[in-house]
Amino acid sequence: MIHIAIAEDDFRVAQIHERLIKQLDGFKIIGKAANAKETLALLKEHKADLLLLDIYMPDELGTALIPDIRSRFPEVDIMIITAATETRHLQEALRAGIAHYLIKPVTADKFRQVLLQYKEKRKLLMSQPEVSQSMIDHIFGNGVKTALPAEDLPTGINSITLRKIKEALQTASEGLTAEELGEKMGASRTTARRYAEYLVSKEEARAELEYGIIGRPERKYYLAAD
């Protein structure tokens, strides 16, 4: 379970974040703070794994608060969600080692995607006693090999995302639904289905209907045999 603290002075935005987080498995909100002072008090009172931090708060800039958080709560990861677009804020955040930087307004899909990616990376780090270069490249998003030149792909299909879909299917011999694919790659079910259906159309994957006990049958996707 990933414990999240929300530091946001706009209560409406904080409520939106809270609602979206509650829709995701594996996350729990430990509390909300409306300013820097409340943020430090919240982190002192409750153990947090991840802090969603706004920059423009009433009593202090979020970026100015980060060194204090790093010193007092080194185990807390920080993700900035802000309307601040000045480059200097991003530079300060990067130097402080933040997990991500999101600019408001953030779409629900993007918000969920970033949290699921964080969850995946955290799980990967906690499950491996040692790291490899490929694992490091995956964590930092480097060393990506594109499966096809961008000009060969239709509109709405990105080569990097397509590669992630193929890798997910490659490691799932039992097949994956669009929802399961979306969770693995940190995207919506609609996006995952679009990419999976594209692979089916290129005969690089196949789809089969799986009938459950109740409800409508689901399409499961399998990587096509070489």
From Swiss-Prot:
A GO-annotated cellular component: cytoplasm
Protein name: Transcriptional regulatory protein CitT
Domain Response regulatory: 3-119
Function: Member of the two-component regulatory system CitT/CitS. Regulates the expression of the citM-yflN operon. Phosphorylated CitT binds to the citM promoter to activate the transcription of the citM-yflN operon.
Major location category of this protein: cytoplasm
Record carries keyword Transcription regulation: yes
Residue ranges of the annotated DNA-binding region, renumbered to this chain: 178-197
Organism name: Bacillus subtilis (strain 168)
GO MF annotations, alphabetized: DNA binding; DNA-binding transcription factor activity; phosphorelay response regulator activity
Gene3D superfamilies named among the record's database cross-references: 3.40.50.2300
Keywords: Activator, Cytoplasm, DNA-binding, Phosphoprotein, Transcription, Transcription regulation, Two-component regulatory system
Residue positions, PTM 4-aspartylphosphate: 54
InterPro entries: 2C-system_Tx_regulators (IPR051271), CheY-like_superfamily (IPR011006), DpiA-like_HTH (IPR048714), Sig_transdc_resp-reg_cit/mal (IPR024187), Sig_transdc_resp-reg_receiver (IPR001789)
Compartments where located: Cytoplasm
Processing after translation: Phosphorylated by CitS.
